[in-house]
Structure formats: structure tokens, C-alpha cells
């Protein structure tokens, strides 16, 4: 089963190029093949979202199992990513 994604490497211009490449690779290799298996569920205000770890960086995403889609909410350094994801939720 293959999931589709809503993400391109240019979506995160503030990250160093090497980190963007590693995040893109993680999305293409892990999230597209099995986002439930590789991701850890989040709690609290981010309940319903999952995360995968790429070194000190995190990718926050949600999965639509019915449509086989992965929505990447945000990616960034672990110190700021969770707050950034919460602010993204406030805008929805």
C-alpha cells in the first residue's frame, strides 16, 4: 500500500539543505510506505497527529487512511516544531 503526500523539499526553506534532503528522504522512504508503522502518535493538542524523528528534527504529520494520504503539517528542529504545529492547528 502506497500513500501519497502533500510535501516538497522547498516547503521548508529555513532548514539547512542537508537537513531538507534528510527530511525528504525520510518522508519518501518511511511515510509513503507505512506512515502508521514508522510514526509515533502525539498526545494533547496534537492528538491525531504523528511524528517521526530525523536526528534532532521532527516531522509532524497526519494520515487519512481512507484516501491513503499523508499531510505533513510541519518539519523542523525539535525545540520549535511542536509549537509550530500547534500554531498551524490554530489557523485551521
Segments (PLM) and residue ranges:
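Arg/Lys-rich, positively charged N-terminal/basic patches that mediate binding to nucleic acids
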Residues: 1-25
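Enriched for short, Lys/Arg-rich terminal
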Residues: 2, 13, 62-92
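A short, surface-exposed loop/turn module that caps and links secondary-structure elements
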Residues: 28-53
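Short, cationic motifs built from Arg/Lys/His that form the positively charged side of catalytic pockets
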Residues: 50-51, 58, 78
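A generic beta-sheet turn/junction motif
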Residues: 54-56, 65
